[in-house]
Structure formats: C-alpha cells, structure tokens
Amino acid sequence: MVGTAEGGAERAVRRWVDAAGGRLVLDGGLATELEANGADLNDPLWSAKCLLSSPHLIRKVHMDYLEAGANIIITASYQATIQGFESKGFSKEQSENLLTKSVQIALEAREMFLKEHLEKSTPIQHPILVAAALGSYGAYLADGSEYSGDYGEAGTKEFLKDFHRRRLQVLAEAGPDLIAFETIPNKLEAQAYVELLEECNINIPSWLSFNSKDGVHVVSGDSLIECATIADKCAKVGAVGINCTPPRFIHGLILSIRKVTDKPILIYPNSGERYDGEKKEWVESTGVSDGDFVSYVNEWCKDGAALIGGCCRTTPNTIRAIHRTLNQGCHKHQLPVA
C-alpha cells in the first residue's frame, strides 16, 4: 500500500504518470458498455446491479478497456452503497462483500490481462491500476441530484460522512491502487470526503473529481476553484479533476484548477450528451463523435492534464483513440512541476 503522509499521494500519482511516459489513460463509460453487452441496468443500483447478476460482464468490460489502452480501470461501485444493497434485502455483511467484489473483479481483470500478454511474449511495461469508485450521495438517491448537488435536508457534512464512512473503509480494504471520488456535485461533499480520508486513515492515494455544466462552477453552483482548493489541501488526495462534463468545457476548467493546485489533473468527460434527470436517460444526438472528442486531447495535454479518459457514453473505441493520440505526441507537452 502506498503511504499518503506528507504529500505521498501526489508523489505516487506522479510516479505512475512518469512510468506511463507522461500521461495515464483512464477507462471510459461502464454502464453503457454493460448495456451494450446485454446487461439490464433499469434499477436504482445501475451498473452495481451487475455485481449481483453478471459479474462476468463487468470483467469483460474492464478487459475491453485494458485492451484499448487504458492504464486505469474504475470499479463498478460508483452506485454501490451499503444502504442501497440493504434496501434490496441484503444484510450489512452481504452488502460489504458486494463492495469488496467490485474491486476483486477489477483486480482479476488486470491479472488476466497481464497474464495473457505475458503468454503472448508481449509483456505490459506500463502501469495498470485499479481505482475503486465512490459516487456521491446523489448517485445513491438515483433521482438526478448528482447533477444538481441539491440534497435537501440531508445536506449536512456529518450526514454525508456517516453515509460514506463504512463504504470507503470496505473499498480501501479490498486492495485497490486508488480511491476515486467521482462526479462530486458540491463543496460540502468534497469537504466530507477529505475529512473521512483523514479520520479513517486511508493510506492509498485518492482523487477528487467534480462535474460542471457551465464550465465555471460545479453543478450545485459552488465555485470550482473553492472545491479544488479543498482537494489541494488534503495530503491524501493525489490528483484533482473533472468528470461527467461536456468536452467543450474542459479547457477552462483545467485552467481554473491549475490556479489553486500543483497536483496532477485528471479529466474524463462524458460524450457531451445531455442527461435528463427526470426521465433518467441520455438525450440522443446531443453529444460529440469519438473523432470530435479526441480532437480536444492535445489541447488538454497542453493545459496540463496528466490523466485523461472518458465517462458516460464513451466506449473502448473512444479510449483507443485517446491512447493513439497520446502516443502520437501529446507526451511531449511538459507537465507542471510541483
């Protein structure tokens, strides 16, 4: 386990970035790929439903992203919570075991991928990492509030800490390389996360990733700069960034984050399609093609992004194109030095 005392989390992420040649490639959308492989995700558990019904599909999607060039695969735990599983009739122990299973599946996929390439005499020389995903409280509610940050009466820091505490501990104990706090919609939840990292003494690097719908603020209306500052001040946070946000906003968001932190910046936008929180569906024909998506990559590199991938509605083809673009020269852009 990588220590995170005195900036160790940031150093760990930078070592991985350097070992990959200057940039790390994240994977892409999980839920849409599971659906493309036949999974039925019409459930509040969303992709976490497959931990119960079809773990083999999760493993396959992880493998598809690794074959496409991803250095980091993110577990199917974004919407997996103890409270959510208990609402389905599972005991606390069973719920915790399902969280652990999400990490185990990703670790198995990595082992299979490395073994296959070793047997082909094409051993993998770059880092292959597993990030355990923690979605926001709004993701558990499955009512679209992860895209608004409006939690109503539940919107207190202590409530959020109590909600996430055991989930964070279980995922960290399962053995991932990183903890990924994803799609953070407001400043309050970011503060809850960094306090939990300290209180629970989580000794593996984490990242905090926010979402924006206007290119200036996080979706709640809170200042992105203030949110990034919270992440910057926590030694257990190794990277700060943006996910589930249209590609056209990323340039300005990276520049805003760089004003307040020297930590590595990660970005994994969605396809640009608009999500209808009431209907719980993506609005067709509102996004960009893989070609248009990848056309932004060189700009993001110049801006200083160190970890680049995709979020909702991106596919292994998107990640393959990002990987190809990075190999064609994006690495030559110098990263900011801490």
Swiss-Prot record:
Its EC number is 2.1.1.10. GO terms for molecular function: S-methylmethionine-homocysteine S-methyltransferase activity; zinc ion binding. Its cofactor is Zn(2+). The keyword Nucleotidyltransferase does not apply. Pfam families: S-methyl_trans. Residues 12-326 form the Hcy-binding domain. One of its GO terms (biological process) is methylation. The keyword Amino-acid biosynthesis applies. NCBIfam families: PRK09485.1 (NF007020). This is Homocysteine S-methyltransferase 3. The lineage of its organism: Eukaryota, Viridiplantae, Streptophyta, Embryophyta, Tracheophyta.
